[in-house]
């Protein structure tokens, strides 16, 4: 009984949205309410939340893939779950559909619902999630806040006519850790905080003139690749 009660507090969309094609959104959600044994008074509120209230009387078969996905989210919210589980919610959608789903996810989260989201799109995780768990072959590689994972000091991309001198100088500098050279571009990863202006001044004072100097932060994707690469090693 306790498991049954707990599941009542969970909403989930695990596979592609599946509703009766010849029924309207409203009719489909009324049927879901009967199955879930919940009142129908939340239907319009949930349709409005996902931006489908104006299309409530349209048949499901007339909906685009993005609209179908939004209807599935509305359906999963009918019992006001404390936890919402979404499996690759933007899979197969166009850019506009992806943006709409992400905004809906943020709105739901802001109302106090915990969302568990499975995604292979790291850009998505970076944009909508506060915490992340990275798994590889069932093994946990990282668990914690997204911003903590990204809290590296970043790295510099540099070009100069004398790349060897630049490499030697940076190698002996405490600010830098790993240094890579590829196709004439030197990438130097920071161990501590250092801004571009200070580095440029430091190089110039040591007789090194660069033609290209850009500071970047590692994206979640780059961090993920680094983590999984280390795990393989």
Where are these regions (language model features)?
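Residues at or immediately preceding the N-termini of alpha-helices
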Residues: 3, 40, 146, 163, ...
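Extended rod-forming repeat segments used as scaffolds/tethers
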Residues: 22, 228-229
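Non-catalytic alpha-helical coupling and interface elements of nucleotide-dependent molecular machines
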Residues: 34-37, 229-233
């Amino acid at each position: 009984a306790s498991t049954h009660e707990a599941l009542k507090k969970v909403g989930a969309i695990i596979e592609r949205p599946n509703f009766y094609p010849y029924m309207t959104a409203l009719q489909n959600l009324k049927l879901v309410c009967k199955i879930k044994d919940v009142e129908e008074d939340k239907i319009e509120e949930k349709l409005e939340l996902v931006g489908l209230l104006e299309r409530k009387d349209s048949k499901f078969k007339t909906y685009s893939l993005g609209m179908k996905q939004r209807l599935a989210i509305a359906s999963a919210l009918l019992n006001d779950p404390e936890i919402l589980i979404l499996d690759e919610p933007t899979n197969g959608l166009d850019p506009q559909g992806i943006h709409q789903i992400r905004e809906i996810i943020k709105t739901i989260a802001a109302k106090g619902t915990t969302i568990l989201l499975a995604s292979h799109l790291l850009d998505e995780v970076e944009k909508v999630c506060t915490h992340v768990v990275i798994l590889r072959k069932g093994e946990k590689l990282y668990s914690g806040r997204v911003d903590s994972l990204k809290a590296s000091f970043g790295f510099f991309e540099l070009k100069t006519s004398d790349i060897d001198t630049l490499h030697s100088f940076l190698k002996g500098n405490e600010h830098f850790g790993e240094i890579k050279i590829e196709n004439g571009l030197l990438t130097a990863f920071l161990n501590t905080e250092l801004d571009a202006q200070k580095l440029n001044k430091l190089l110039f004072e040591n007789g090194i003139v660069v033609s290209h100097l850009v500071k970047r932060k590692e994206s979640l994707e780059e961090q993920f690749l680094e983590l999984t690469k280390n795990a393989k090693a």
